[in-house]
C-alpha cells in the first residue's frame, strides 16, 4: 500500500515539475518584455515606489501550488494547445480552388478528342462463337422412326445501330449519356463516363407540342433527364393528347434459333432477355429435338433525342480536363460515345416451338406470324397444331400480358394487338437507343460477327413394299436398297440390302410384303416378265431407281406376255 502511495506522489511530482517548467518559461518571456518597456519609460517612473519582482511572486505562488498539489488526490491534466491553420494559408487554398474552377479546358478537350486515333468498326467489333468441331450428321433410331440430324456451319454479320435496352443499363443509356466504345458496349453493358457537364437540350417527338417539346436540362444526369422526360410526357397527356393520335411505328423481325450468339445478332437483342423470359432450350435445339422461332415486335410510342454537339467539348463543363476523362477510361481503345436518342414504347417477344421434324416448320411459323390463314395448308396446319407459343410483353401495361403460354396462336395475335395505343394506363418503356462517337457524331453500330451451327432434323418413318403379280407370265424381281447410318464423326455409313427372292421366278398370282427400315434410301425396284420370244426372252415391266420411302409402296404387274403392264403407287 505504501508503494502505491509513493508511486502516486512521485507521479504528482513529475507532473508538477513539468508544469513549473512551463510556468518558468512564461515568466522569463514576461521579464524580457518588461525590460524593454522599462527602457522606453525610464524618465516617467523615477518618482514611483519600487514594486516587488514579478518572478519572485510567481515563484512563491508556484511553490504554494506545488505543495497543494502534492497533498491533493486530484489528477493533473495537461491539455495540448491546438495551433490553428494560418488565415493566409486558408486564403491561398481558396484562391487555388477558385482558379482551378475558372480555368477553361475547352480547347484542350477538343484537341485531345479530335486527335484520338481509332477504327469505328474495330473498337465496336463483337466476335461471337467460333465453330471448330461439330458432327455434321447424326442418325437416331426411335421405334419405327429414323431421325437424321444435320448440322451446317454458318456465319452472320450484322451492324445494328439501335441497341436493345435492358433494365440493368437504363441509368447509362438515357438521352445525352456519355459512354465508352469498348467491349462492354458491344455486350450491352456500357460503361458510363460521369463528370461535370454543360446544360443539355432534349426533344420529345410527341405530336402537337411544338416548341414545348424541347427543354434544357441544366445538369444532364440520369435522374435529371428522366425527370425532364416525365414532365414532358405529363404535359402532353394534360394538354395535347386529346386531339392527337400517335403514328404507328412498329418494327418486326423474326428468326429461327440455332445458338445464343446467332439469335443475338439476328434480332439485335441480348440473349439473356430471351432466355430469361421465354425459356429457350438451346440444348434441345442443338440436338435437333426442337425447332424454335423468335419474333420481336417493337412498337415505338415516342423518341427522345439529345441535341448533337458541334464540338466534343460542348458537352463538358469548362473545368473538365482530358486527364480526368483518361482516368475514367477514355482512350484510343475506348473513345467516348454520346447517346443521341432513346426510343420508348413496348416490345413483344413471341416464341414458336415445335418438336416437328418437318422441313416446312420455318415456313409455317412465318405464315402464322404474318397472319396467313394456315388452315387451308394441311402441312402448315399439322405443324402448328403440334406447336406451343409463348408471348412476353416488356413495357406498356405489361401486367395484363406479362407472359402468355398457349397452344392457340390467335391468343398471341390478340396480345400483339392489345394495348397498342399510348396512354397513362399504358406507359412507354425504354426499348432501344442509338449512340454516336463524340469525335464526329458518327453512329456507333456494333459489328456483330459470329459463327453458328444450323441444325435441321428430318424424320423418316419405316415403310414397306407390297408386291402383287397378276400377269399371264412368269415374273422375276430385283429389289435393292441402302440402309444409312452415321459414325461418331458424322460420316455416312451405307449398308447394301437386297430382297432374298431376287431373280426367283414367280407365277401368277403372287404377292408378298417387304419391310423397309426408316433409314432405307436409294430404293430400286425392277420387275421383268418372260415373253417366250427367242430374241427377247425377258422384258422389263418396271425399272425404277430412287423410289422414295413411303408408308406403303405398292408394286403391281399384270397383263400378258406381249402386253405387260406395271405400276408403282404410294400410300
From Swiss-Prot:
| Signal peptide region | 1-33
InterPro entries listed in its UniProt record: Thiol_cytolys_C, Thiol_cytolys_C_sf, Thiol_cytolysin, Thiol_cytolysin_ab_sf, Thiol_cytolysin_sf
Which key words are in the record?
Answer: Cytolysis, Hemolysis, Host cell membrane, Host membrane, Lipid-binding, Membrane, Secreted, Signal, Toxin, Transmembrane, Transmembrane beta strand, Virulence
Which PROSITE patterns does the protein's record reference?
A: THIOL_CYTOLYSINS
Q: Which Gene3D superfamilies match?
A: 3.30.1040.20, Perfringolysin, Perfringolysin, domain 4, Thiol-activated cytolysin superfamily/Thiol-activated cytolysin, alpha-beta domain
Q: Which intervals carry biased composition (Low complexity)?
A: 37-48
Family label: Belongs to the cholesterol-dependent cytolysin family.
Name under which the protein is recorded: Streptolysin O
Q: Which organism is it from?
A: Streptococcus pyogenes serotype M18 (strain MGAS8232)
Gene giving rise to this polypeptide: slo
